[in-house]
Amino acid sequence: MQSRKDWILAGQDMLRKEGIAGLKLSALTATLGVSTGSFYHHFADFEQYLGAVAEFFSADRVQGVIDQTMIDNPDPVTRIRRLAKLSLEDHTFELDAAMRIWATMDERAAVTVERSERLVLGFLAQAFEDLGFAPAEAALRARILLSVNIASLRTSNEKGRRNYFRQALEVLVAPVGKV
């Protein structure tokens, strides 16, 4: 029998690949190789399941990636780079794109996207403050860098996304007047 978390992770993977329209119970049971009985052991209905998939995105996935960046307490730029690297490796950027589309149709997804943005913006703003930027400027730089990531999701080429992010980060971490 699959665990509740197995179902949620499978749903997030399907959401990332197929979008919200492709997230169906029949496809999930086929992917996991189980019957619907396993599903109903963990969730009362599909609506409850969708709420759990949405909640897990910010509560576990995004926070987990942020927590991993702090291992060994690296310098601020390394923390930001780790966040980008880990987000690429575990497909968080792609899932974020799917979550943003879903958020236009479902309040649960909208709430979790907003929560994940707050987590990421707080993380980035702290990194910029640690680089010596005043809080207001650090918050602005954090928002710009997050916007760069959201915009780069439309770039289908992973190398292009990485270059775009690297160039933006170089500009944003440079002291004022040094770009």
Each language-model region and where it sits:
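N-terminal intrinsically disordered/low-complexity leader segments
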Residues: 1-2, 179
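Helix-turn-helix
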Residues: 3-6, 10-48, 52
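Solvent-exposed, amphipathic alpha-helical segments
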Residues: 6, 10-18, 64, 68, ...
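Hydrophobic alpha-helical connector segments
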Residues: 52, 66-93, 97, 142-145
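Short, basic, alpha-helical segments at the C-terminal edge of helix-turn-helix-like DNA-binding modules
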Residues: 55-62
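Amphipathic alpha-helical packing segments from all-alpha helical-bundle domains
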Residues: 62, 67, 91-97, 107-132, ...
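Hydrophobic/aromatic-rich alpha-helical bundle segments in the mid-to-C-terminal region
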Residues: 110, 114, 129-179
